[in-house]
């Protein structure tokens, strides 16, 4: 039943996108779209599981970043095609048997369409308001992460129980505080340095990365895992909150840099 609902949602998004924003034949858009698909698939294949403070369950992958840049660069129709192609080819190359779970296909669609719609509808006044909201959200996420770490003494990861000792908690607090500080310094530095057009691009990069991290990483993906494997929704939030505190600043820097380079090339 969930597959049918997800299929209807994906098809509805596609109908809306192609009806509201009819595609125009554009060789440059096609070429960029193909490059984004290739880059996303390569990064997906390079994803690795690494130990994080002794916990071997943190998946490091940057595959979402080319999709976000695609959303900020391409027309909505091309964004939809890029997301579907990336998900399909990724499954083919991974040699995954059976029918794919469409929840992750919906993730890919949102990872391109959310940035694209932000690009279309966001104006300067809304940018400044949303930037403040983003900062507040980041502080809240960081505080929740610290509070959660402070309250737990052990965590079940990959079927094994790990003790969260005081030195580990302190290290996590320092990492969260450091990444949040770096993010705010980075935002302030570029706000004072960039011209108006580049500042708009920078705001879009910030809002896109944070929006995707909150909707896909923090909400949808845990829900899909609960639906597929019965993993409790909050079981993985410990690692996801910590991962978001690190990956959001990194993602903003990479997305903005990639987007700025592409804009210079296509101008």
Describe the role of every protein-language-model region.
Residues 1-267:
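Loop-helix junctions at membrane interfaces
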């Amino acid at each position: 039943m969930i597959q049918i609902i997800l299929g209807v949602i994906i098809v509805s998004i596609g109908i809306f996108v192609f009806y509201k924003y009819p595609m125009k034949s554009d060789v440059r858009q096609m070429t960029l779209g193909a490059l984004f698909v290739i880059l996303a698939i390569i990064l997906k294949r390079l994803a690795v599981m690494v130990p994080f403070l002794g916990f071997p369950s943190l998946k490091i992958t940057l595959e979402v970043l080319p999709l976000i840049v695609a959303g900020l660069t391409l027309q909505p129709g091309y964004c939809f095609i890029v997301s579907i192609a990336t998900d399909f080819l990724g499954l083919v190359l991974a040699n995954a048997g059976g029918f794919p779970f469409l929840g992750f296909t919906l993730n890919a669609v949102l990872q391109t369409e959310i940035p694209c719609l932000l690009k279309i509808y966001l104006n300067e006044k809304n940018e400044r308001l949303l930037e403040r909201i983003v900062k507040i959200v980041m502080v809240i996420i960081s505080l929740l992460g610290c509070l959660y770490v402070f309250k737990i003494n052990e965590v079940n990861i990959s079927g094994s129980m790990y003790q969260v000792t005081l030195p580990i908690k302190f290290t996590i607090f320092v990492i969260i505080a450091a990444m949040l500080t770096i993010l705010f310094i980075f935002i302030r530095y570029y706000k004072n340095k960039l011209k108006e057009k580049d500042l708009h691009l920078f705001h879009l990069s910030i809002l896109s990365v944070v929006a995707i991290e909150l909707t896909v990483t923090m909400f949808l993906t845990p829900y899909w895992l609960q639906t597929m494997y019965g993993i409790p929704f909050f079981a993985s939030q410990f690692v996801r909150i910590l991962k978001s505190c690190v990956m959001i600043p990194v993602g903003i820097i990479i997305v903005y840099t990639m987007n700025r380079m592409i804009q210079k090339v296509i101008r």
